[in-house]
A protein has these predicted regions:
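A structural signal for conserved, well-ordered secondary-structure elements
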Residues: 1-480
Length: 480
């Protein structure tokens, strides 16, 4: 089994991803500064340090990671890391504003903000570390620094079959670890320094009002009272996904089912029926499918897929390209990418991916159950996992609807959702635990949960918006 990509396509793709990362960072920075003023400005500085350090590590700049190289999934991980790195700063800034609204002094509000925000930051980052470790351990190489760390634990997964997933996991792990340095420690040092610098010792610079207090309003949405509406919507969404599966079926990439997939760039118009006959005759295959599209550089592409055990040799690929350019000289066919996967290896990779997902779910469940053992334990962990499975199922439905083949990148996306979406749940659980200690039996459980969700609503919306901005920019720039 092997996979190749055209150097020109790889270079153009790299340029596009770098542009997307820069644009995403600028937009997130503007939003943070406008929303949080001085803490937002400091957050941008810490994010710059985090992004630069992550780029240095994943590029192999530090000799302790000699095998590290910058890849497209790695850049995607850095861009996602920008969105995720905002989380720690948003939690802290929101808590500072909330404490200012209680008419605390600026220094008292800052100290309380850091103290109350640290626990959910740690819990959220630990879940990402769990996911990153599974991505690296299950899909990583069999030698090198990280192999020595993970192979004794993940030896039962067997040898690596997807280096791109490992690269994505390595970038996630690097981003999270550096987030502790820049998003927690560096931000804390800079904000506390600003508090003790007289020209900046003004509450309005930290989200408060000049006359005192802060514009911090807690919503009063009755989430528990409207839970039946949410249940109905979720059930309807799941039903729609199941209908999509029945109508369209689930499309598997060659990574899972085995076979060959060749992507060719070309110019002008192409007759698919005629091309299928020509390619089938040249390869001596009849069970092939053709699909047109475009690559990240905007070139027209033709994707040829041969399922099962019908893998191709390098000689066959060269002969095919020569035959196409001889018969269709005006189209100027150029090989972009080739993936050859043995059917047995494809099935093994599928099983490995499912096991990795299950392992991530179990580990996150156990961690959440332990951390929140005073407010439900296993019930809290199980509920969190059910919500995550719901999110992953919706993403699965989008792949089915858009006819996007399921492959290693899909598994990486699901594992990322596992680690990232749990952050919102962790923050809410942390609030429930805090409010339970404050109010105890003074409030019923539904009232306690409603209050906690509403108090966390602003933070959840802000982190979701920043992450969506980062990911949307990648999509838009890739299309343009």
């Amino acid at each position: 089994s092997y996979s190749t990509i055209s150097p020109s396509l790889g270079a153009k793709s790299l340029d596009v991803m770098v542009q997307a990362g820069i644009i995403a960072f600028i937009l997130v920075a503007i939003l943070m500064i406008v929303r949080y003023r001085l803490p937002g400005t400091i957050a941008v500085i810490s994010l710059m340090g985090q992004a630069a350090a992550t780029l240095a590590v994943v590029s192999g700049y530090f000799t302790v990671f000699p095998g590290s190289t910058l890849t497209l999934p790695g850049i995607a991980g850095i861009i996602l890391g920008i969105g995720m790195g905002v989380d720690a700063n948003v939690i802290t800034a929101e808590r500072i504003k909330e404490e200012l609204s209680k008419n605390k002094t600026l220094e008292g509000a800052v100290n309380s903000g850091f103290k109350m925000g640290l626990t959910p930051i740690i819990d959220g980052n630990v879940t990402i570390v769990i996911v990153a470790a599974i991505l690296m351990g299950a899909f990583g190489p069999t030698d090198g620094f990280w192999a020595k760390v993970f192979n004794p634990i993940f030896y039962w997964f067997g040898p690596s079959t997807a280096g791109t997933i490992y690269s994505f996991g390595f970038t996630l792990l690097t981003s999270v670890l550096l987030n502790f340095v820049f998003g927690v420690w560096a931000t804390r040092v800079m904000i506390r320094g600003a508090v003790h610098f007289k020209p900046l010792r003004k509450a309005w610079l930290f989200g408060g009002k000049k006359e005192g207090g802060a514009d911090f309003k807690t919503p009063s949405i009755n989430f528990i009272g409207n839970r039946k509406k949410f249940y109905t919507f979720s059930c309807a969404l799941i039903a729609v996904v199941l209908v999509f599966c029945g109508i369209f079926g689930v499309k598997m990439d060659v990574e899972f089912k085995g076979g060959s997939m060749i992507t060719l760039a070309y110019e002008g118009d192409a007759d698919l029926s005629d091309l299928k006959s020509t390619i089938g005759a040249e390869l001596g295959k009849s069970n092939l499918t053709l699909q047109t599209g475009s690559d990240i550089s905007g070139n027209q592409t033709l994707t040829v897929t041969l399922p099962g055990s019908d893998t191709l040799t390098t000689e066959q690929l060269d002969n095919l390209l020569a035959a196409l350019n001889e018969q269709y000289p005006d189209n100027k066919f150029v090989q972009n990418e080739v993936s050859n996967v043995d059917a047995t290896i494809g099935k093994e990779f599928l099983v490995k991916s499912v096991v990795a997902l299950v392992a991530a779910c179990v580990l996150i469940l156990l961690y959440v159950a332990y951390r929140f053992r005073k407010i439900g334990g296993l019930k809290a962990g199980s509920t969190a996992i059910v919500a995550l499975l719901h999110d992953m199922f919706v993403v699965f439905g989008v792949f089915v609807l858009l006819r996007i083949p399921l492959n290693g990148n899909f598994i990486a996306a699901l594992l990322t959702i596992l680690g990232y979406s749990i952050n919102d749940t962790v923050v809410i659980y942390d609030r429930i635990r805090e409010n339970n200690g404050l109010y105890g039996k003074k409030m019923s459980l539904p009232e306690l949960v409603n209050l906690s969700i509403n108090q966390s609503f602003g933070r959840s919306m802000m982190t979701s918006i920043t992450t969506c901005i980062a990911l949307a920019i990648v999509c838009v720039v890739s299309i343009i």
